[in-house]
Amino acid sequence: MKVRASVKSICKDCKVIRRNGSVRVICKNPRHKQRQG
């Protein structure tokens, strides 16, 4: 899980979603998981 100021989708499988007011990226590649912090 990377915590970043700006979350971007890295590959075509990444999905940017809002969960409980925080922006997250979920992907089948676990290295691409991010959240805004």
Swiss-Prot record:
Range of residues in the leader sequence: none
Keywords: Ribonucleoprotein, Ribosomal protein
Chain segments annotated as coiled-coil in the UniProt record: none
Sequence similarity: Belongs to the bacterial ribosomal protein bL36 family.
GO molecular function annotations of the record: structural constituent of ribosome
PROSITE patterns in the record: RIBOSOMAL_L36
Official protein name in the record: Large ribosomal subunit protein bL36
GO cellular component, one term: cytoplasm
